[in-house]
């Protein structure tokens, strides 16, 4: 059975998401995947350079010292920190932790995640620099 009624289709521009700050921030957060891809490719390139000997590794280190690569890596670091911050803020919403018959607030969980991140970072830096 068909109908002759024409359904109402609300006009939607391609930039609809730019009007609300929530959606702009959502797109920014989802966009942090692009720098993560850059870092993944760079890391794989470095592993292959390490596999192929000292000369290849020195070429990779020279590549990393390029100012454009340094800027891209700083952008990647900022994107990773933004993604980490938003992820840590979402984590308490997924966990329902009850302490003394009261639901725990998100602050201790967020602070705990940042402490774990800082400790793991310090341990990795210590192993990389002094071991």
UniProtKB/Swiss-Prot annotation:
SUPFAM superfamilies given in the database record: Fumarate reductase respiratory complex transmembrane subunits
Annotated compartments: Cell inner membrane
Superkingdom assignment: Bacteria
Keyword Transmembrane: yes
Annotated transmembrane regions: 30-50, 57-77, 109-129
Biological role: Two distinct, membrane-bound, FAD-containing enzymes are responsible for the catalysis of fumarate and succinate interconversion; fumarate reductase is used in anaerobic growth, and succinate dehydrogenase is used in aerobic growth. Anchors the catalytic components of the fumarate reductase complex to the cell inner membrane, binds quinones.
Assigned keywords, A-Z: Cell inner membrane, Cell membrane, Membrane, Transmembrane, Transmembrane helix
UniProt cross-references to NCBIfam families, sorted A to Z: PRK04987.1
Similarity comment text for this entry: Belongs to the FrdC family.
GO-annotated molecular function: succinate dehydrogenase activity
Subunit-structure text: Part of an enzyme complex containing four subunits: a flavoprotein (FrdA), an iron-sulfur protein (FrdB), and two hydrophobic anchor proteins (FrdC and FrdD).
One GO cellular component term: fumarate reductase complex
Name listed for the protein in its UniProt record: Fumarate reductase subunit C
Membrane-topology descriptor: Multi-pass membrane protein
SS bonds (residue pairs): none
């Amino acid at each position: 059975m068909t109908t002759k009624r024409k359904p109402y289709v609300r006009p939607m521009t391609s930039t609809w998401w730019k009007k609300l700050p929530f959606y702009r921030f959502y797109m920014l957060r989802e966009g942090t995947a692009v720098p993560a891809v850059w870092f993944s490719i760079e890391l794989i390139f470095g592993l292959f350079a390490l596999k192929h000997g000292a000369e290849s590794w020195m070429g990779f280190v020279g590549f990393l010292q390029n100012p454009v690569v340094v800027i891209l890596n700083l952008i990647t670091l900022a994107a990773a920190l933004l993604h980490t911050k938003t992820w840590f803020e979402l984590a308490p919403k997924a966990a329902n932790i009850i302490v003394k018959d009261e639901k725990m607030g998100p602050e201790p969980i967020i602070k705990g995640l940042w402490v774990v991140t800082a400790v793991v970072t310090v341990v990795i830096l210590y192993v990389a620099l002094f071991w």
